[in-house]
């Protein structure tokens, strides 16, 4: 331990606060909170720890701390510091883990949508639905039952939904505000838990249709009732008080924490959320950090009540989240907490079992591959693939597998710079040259095996650069595909000879994963570049659209198809002035221009 660390540890205060661990570059790598800073920070440098925590401690060369007046203030400060520094060892719930909502838009002719983006608009949002399939099934049922507008842009004539009885065709007919309000009120009633009432009304209509000999209509209503029954079956009543509550449970094992959240809505357990992450703190502190981040995410609406395990400071949770937080001692809520705890424990056990089994298989596959090729075990494998369509935007990609597993931080993308036109062999020469020239210059780790996605020509080009230009002698193999573009066999040696592997062997599956992954990485990069160029060229002739606005539109919509489907309002939401949004919409609506 550095001497200055010992000196700082000796004068730590016995007060609540936050601490920031730093590496040799001065980068904050971990942020924590403590009821007593002196005890918590010292604990990292004393006693025994698991390997994961030892890695963290091994990187710490300095720390700083901030004293707070209370545990609540420490929790709030910790969350803000994590957001500010994004430390690599902290829990960081990603913003992309959002749940879908069902939205009724506030348009003159409202629509029913699935969205993950909750906005402060006049629309009505229902959810979240942790199970996206459940959200889509519910919307599909509502679309059948209630004839709101379906099209994002008003067509010139009635569409199929009108003929199916699922739309009132406001595009060509007058649909009054009262008509829409009546439909919207029915949808709201259904989404607020009024399934039984809606079912009863449909049942009455079904019998009336049967009496009038309207058998098609009766069958349609019967199908709708069956769909409601299916939804209700998945949401059995478990609480009689109909209070919306989130029930939390957790388990900790081998330096990992699993938190399970049961979402109870209107007395029904509708779904659960499962999160697993490494933990470097006391379990209770890690849980509090998790729950703070969980509700900071805009997709998690706070219910009326939050139920937490007995080991958690419920008063702190209540003050921080400003909702009722309880620690049940008996009854149904306690049973649910214990069930959440049990599920969390089982999830961790399954995780470790699968990891252990997968690691054994993977390492064995790497060892077997080395034996089959007659080389040392290739613990580090690097693979290359080229991608171009009709000679446009030629690119190449390199991926790395370490101990048989993808090491995504090691992946590299290459735009082809020196080759004119679609020349796969010269492109391969260029990227191999660039990759290993840099590796030699910067002292980067070299692979035990290089895999080239291609045949003899690709292998010869890459080998020539590696050996004759760079003086490197690393085993290199070509990965040959069959006529269905599937992994067939390897070629290796000079001259290259085929190495046939058993198709059901672990080493063959490893090669398939490598080939699929390098192809995916290369083609994704190529499509990104190609998509950008297509969108940018398609927008070149629109007045008021320069490079800056092209980038904004590209980032917001991602594809020309989505832009063509967008409304004027959606272009405004993307940051376009209204007059520019109208110009873009008109331009893209004219199919002849594209």
UniProtKB/Swiss-Prot annotation:
Keyword presence, Signal: no
Record SUPFAM superfamilies: C-terminal UvrC-binding domain of UvrB, GIY-YIG endonuclease, RuvA domain 2-like
SMART domains: GIYc
PROSITE patterns from the UniProt entry: GIY_YIG (PS50164), UVR (PS50151), UVRC (PS50165)
GO function terms (MF aspect): DNA binding; excinuclease ABC activity
Domain GIY-YIG residues, every copy: 14-91
GO-annotated cellular components: cytoplasm; excinuclease repair complex
Domain UVR: from-to ranges: 196-231
UniProt superkingdom: Bacteria
Primary location class: cytoplasm
Protein family: Belongs to the UvrC family.
Cited function: The UvrABC repair system catalyzes the recognition and processing of DNA lesions. UvrC both incises the 5' and 3' sides of the lesion. The N-terminal half is responsible for the 3' incision and the C-terminal half is responsible for the 5' incision.
Quaternary assembly: Interacts with UvrB in an incision complex.
PANTHER family found in the cross-reference section: UVRABC SYSTEM PROTEIN C, UVRC/OXIDOREDUCTASE
Name recorded for this polypeptide: UvrABC system protein C
Naturally occurring in which organism (per UniProt): Bacillus cereus (strain Q1)
Name of the gene encoding the protein in the UniProt record: uvrC
């Amino acid at each position: 331990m550095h001497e200055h660390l010992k000196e700082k540890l000796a004068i730590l205060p016995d007060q609540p606060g936050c601490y920031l661990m730093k590496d040799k570059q001065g980068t904050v790598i971990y942020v924590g909170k403590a009821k007593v800073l002196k005890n918590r920070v010292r604990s990292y440098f004393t006693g025994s720890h698991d390997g994961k925590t030892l890695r963290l401690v091994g990187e710490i060369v300095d720390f700083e701390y901030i004293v707070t007046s209370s545990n609540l203030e420490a929790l709030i400060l910790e969350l803000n510091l994590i957001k500010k520094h994004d430390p690599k060892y902290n829990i960081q719930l990603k913003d992309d883990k959002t749940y879908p909502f069902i939205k009724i838009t506030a348009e003159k002719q409202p629509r029913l949508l699935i969205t993950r983006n909750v906005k402060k608009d006049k629309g009505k949002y229902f959810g979240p639905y942790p199970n996206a399939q459940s959200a889509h099934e519910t919307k599909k049922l509502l679309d059948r039952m209630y004839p709101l507008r379906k099209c994002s842009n008003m067509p010139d004539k009635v569409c199929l939904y009108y003929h199916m009885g699922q739309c009132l065709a406001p595009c060509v007919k007058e649909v009054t505000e009262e008509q829409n309000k009546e439909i919207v009120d029915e949808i709201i009633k259904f989404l607020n838990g009024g399934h039984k009432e809606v079912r009863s009304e449909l049942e009455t209509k079904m019998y009336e249709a049967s009496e009038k000999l309207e058998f098609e209509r009766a069958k349609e209503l019967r199908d709708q009732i069956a769909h409601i029954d299916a939804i209700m079956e998945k949401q059995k009543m478990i609480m009689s008080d109909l209070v919306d509550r989130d029930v939390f449970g957790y388990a900790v094992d081998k330096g990992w924490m699993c938190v399970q959240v049961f979402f109870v809505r209107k007395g029904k357990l509708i779904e659960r959320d499962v999160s697993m992450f490494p933990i470097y703190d006391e379990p209770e502190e890690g849980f509090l950090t998790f729950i703070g981040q969980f509700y900071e995410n805009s997709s998690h609406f706070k219910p009326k009540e939050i139920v937490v395990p007995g080991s958690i400071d419920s008063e702190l949770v209540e003050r921080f989240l400003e909702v009722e937080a309880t620690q049940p001692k008996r009854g149904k809520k306690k049973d649910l907490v214990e069930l959440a705890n049990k599920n969390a424990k089982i999830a961790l056990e399954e995780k470790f079992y699968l990891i252990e089994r997968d690691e054994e298989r993977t390492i064995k596959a790497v060892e077997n591959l080395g034996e089959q090729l007659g080389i040392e075990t290739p613990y580090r494998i690097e693979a290359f693939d080229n991608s171009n369509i009709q000679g446009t935007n030629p690119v190449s990609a390199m991926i790395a597998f370490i101990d048989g597993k993808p090491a995504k931080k090691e992946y590299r993308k290459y735009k082809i710079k020196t080759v004119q036109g679609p020349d796969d062999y010269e492109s391969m020469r260029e990227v191999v040259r660039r990759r290993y020239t840099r590796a030699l210059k910067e002292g980067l780790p070299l692979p035990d095996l290089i895999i080239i996605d291609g045949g003899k020509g690709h292998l010869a080009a890459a080998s020539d650069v590696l050996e004759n230009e760079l003086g490197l002698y690393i085993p290199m193999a070509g990965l040959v595909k069959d006529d269905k573009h599937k992994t067939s066999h390897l070629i290796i040696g000079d001259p290259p000879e085929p190495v046939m592997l058993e198709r059901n062997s672990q080493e063959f599956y490893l090669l398939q994963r490598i080939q699929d992954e390098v192809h995916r990485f290369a083609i994704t990069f190529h499509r990104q570049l190609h998509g950008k160029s297509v969108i940018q060229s398609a927008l070149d002739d629109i007045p008021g659209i320069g490079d800056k606005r092209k980038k904004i539109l590209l980032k917001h919509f991602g594809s020309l198809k989505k832009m063509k489907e967008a409304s004027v309002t959606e272009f405004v939401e993307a940051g376009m002035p209204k007059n520019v949004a109208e110009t873009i919409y008109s331009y893209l609506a004219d199919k002849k221009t594209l």
